[in-house]
């Protein structure tokens, strides 16, 4: 019981910075028809209600692709696509309206009761839908008339902001009207993407059947830049995947990211609590598309001393690193390089140059326990080696008691004390007996 309580406390402590950071921000959440059909959908809705209770401004966009196809199949009506876009004739439009209307009522009801059976039971969630989007027809392409398939002409973002200011969740579907009063079938990814851009949303969030984008070995890729995401889209399309939740969301995420939306997140609709884990933990659980990485490798400043001390103290207590006082760190802070993730220092290293001997020491190498199985140490080594080359240094050495093989695997070879700069030879601790490893730059 005590262990569970400790986990709860630690989890809450780690989530508090994200609660504060997200409060008052606008998120656009895209719910594809596949996510709505899944048995975990009620949990997703409950988590959306939780986000609303934490002061996050929410616009929820829902799709209805499988529900529309099901309606068509029941009426023995074959869906028609041109260039992977549905052709919406008059009969299809009626089924689109029917599916979208039922989903709007269902999602509104679920959101309205999403805080039941929680400590916030009794809190009222106001869900608002309306004609915030004006549509226009796609027209004719290669002789094919898309009929009532449309695209966005304009968005009344001021009206949406007023609803968000009043504490409502704005719920929008795939049907919008034109200035002439006609109805058009839109794609949920276009609606979500354009809303995120026009509302200057902090995040756009989507769901797919997997936990995100995976590499060739099936591992989740936690972060993609737009160009990488575009390459992934092209790879999937070459495999014949044009309309999966992953591809549809990635297309929108690339556009949103390049248009100022800071982060777009792709999560699994099958994973219970994926939305909460992604937004309120440092490493998340899915894939995010970003213009700027959540992680930065940079030179340390005086403001980083607390984070560096917190990182290296456990290693000093274990005897792995030589102890450094706060005063010493303050004097030597310009020699340190850190890796920072969401304002947490997760790795550090220092470069001490000896210009006369054209050699440098890489020291105080530390990586947060949660990230030691990743490539952060290698990132620091490359950065420090580049700094040494820019200083005109020819060699780099390290003194280590534990990481001998790690450095040897990266080009360092064992050496004797006499290869060290004279100043360093005089300070060498023969009782500690650190191994000396040397690499050419």
Swiss-Prot record:
| Enzyme class, first EC level, given as a word | transferase
What GO molecular function terms would the record report?
L-glutamate N-acetyltransferase activity
Q: In which pathway does it act?
A: Amino-acid biosynthesis; L-arginine biosynthesis; N(2)-acetyl-L-ornithine from L-glutamate: step 1/4
Give the source's domain of life in one word: Bacteria
Q: Which InterPro entries match?
A: AceGlu_kinase-like_sf, Acyl_CoA_acyltransferase, Asp/Glu/Uridylate_kinase, GNAT_dom, NAGS_kin, NH2A_AcTrfase
CDD domains from the UniProt entry: AAK_NAGS-ABP, NAT_SF
Q: Which organism is it from?
A: Yersinia enterocolitica serotype O:8 / biotype 1B (strain NCTC 13174 / 8081)
- Cellular component annotations (GO), alphabetically ordered: cytoplasm
Keywords from the named record: Acyltransferase, Amino-acid biosynthesis, Arginine biosynthesis, Cytoplasm, Transferase
Subcellular compartments: Cytoplasm
In the record, the note on similarity to other proteins reads:
Belongs to the acetyltransferase family. ArgA subfamily.
Query: Start and end of every N-acetyltransferase domain?
Result: 295-434
Q: Which Pfam families match?
A: AA_kinase, Acetyltransf_1
Do the record's keywords include Cytoplasm? Answer: yes
Q: Which HAMAP family match?
A: N_acetyl_glu_synth
Read off the Gene3D superfamilies from this record: 3.40.630.30, Acetylglutamate kinase-like
Subunit architecture = Homohexamer.
E.C. no: 2.3.1.1
According to its UniProt entry, the protein's GO biological process terms are:
L-arginine biosynthetic process
Q: Which reaction does it catalyse?
A: L-glutamate + acetyl-CoA = N-acetyl-L-glutamate + CoA + H(+)
Entry annotated with the keyword Cytoplasm: yes
**What is the protein name stated in its UniProt record?**
Amino-acid acetyltransferase
């Amino acid at each position: 019981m005590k262990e569970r309580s400790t986990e709860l406390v630690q989890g809450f402590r780690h989530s508090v910075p994200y609660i504060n950071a997200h409060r008052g921000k606008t998120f656009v959440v895209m719910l594809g028809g596949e996510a709505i059909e899944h048995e975990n959908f009620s949990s997703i809705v409950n988590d959306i209600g939780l986000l609303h209770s934490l002061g996050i401004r929410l616009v929820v966009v829902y799709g209805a692709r499988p529900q529309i196809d099901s309606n068509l199949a029941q009426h023995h009506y074959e869906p028609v696509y041109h260039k992977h876009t549905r052709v919406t004739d008059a009969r299809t439009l009626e089924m689109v309206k029917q599916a979208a209307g039922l989903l709007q009522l269902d999602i509104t009801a679920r959101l309205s009761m999403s805080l039941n059976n929680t400590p916030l039971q009794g809190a009222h969630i106001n869900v608002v839908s309306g004609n915030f989007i004006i549509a226009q027809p796609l027209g004719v392409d290669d002789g094919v008339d898309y009929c009532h398939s449309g695209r966005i002409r304009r968005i009344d973002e001021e009206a949406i902001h007023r609803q968000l200011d009043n504490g409502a969740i704005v719920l929008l579907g795939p049907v919008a009207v034109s200035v002439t009063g006609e109805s058009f079938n839109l794609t949920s990814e276009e609606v979500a993407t354009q809303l995120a851009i026009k509302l200057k949303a902090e995040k756009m969030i989507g769901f797919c059947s997997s936990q995100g984008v995976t590499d060739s070995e099936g591992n989740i890729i936690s972060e993609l830049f737009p160009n990488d995401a575009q390459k992934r889209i092209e790879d999937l399309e070459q495999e014949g995947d044009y309309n999966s939740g992953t591809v549809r969301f990635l297309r929108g995420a690339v556009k949103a990211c390049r248009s100022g939306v800071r982060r777009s997140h792709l999560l699994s609709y099958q994973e219970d609590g994926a939305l909460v884990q992604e937004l309120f933990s440092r490493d998340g659980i899915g894939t995010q598309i970003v213009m700027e990485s959540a992680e930065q490798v940079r030179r340390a400043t005086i403001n980083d001393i607390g984070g560096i001390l917190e990182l290296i103290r456990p290693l000093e207590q274990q005897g792995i690193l030589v102890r450094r006082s706060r005063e010493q760190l303050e004097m030597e802070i310009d020699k340190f390089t850190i890796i920072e993730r969401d304002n947490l220092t997760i790795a550090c290293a220092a470069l001490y140059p000896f210009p006369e001997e054209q050699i440098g020491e890489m020291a105080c190498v530390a990586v947060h326990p949660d990230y030691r199985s990743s490539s952060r140490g290698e990132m620091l080594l490359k950065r420090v080696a580049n700094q040494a080359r820019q200083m005109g240094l020819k060699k780099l050495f390290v003194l280590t008691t534990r990481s001998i093989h790690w450095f040897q695997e990266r080009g360092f070879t064992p050496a004797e004390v006499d290869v060290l700069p004279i100043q360093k030879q005089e300070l060498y601790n023969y009782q500690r007996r650190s191994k000396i490893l040397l690499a050419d730059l």
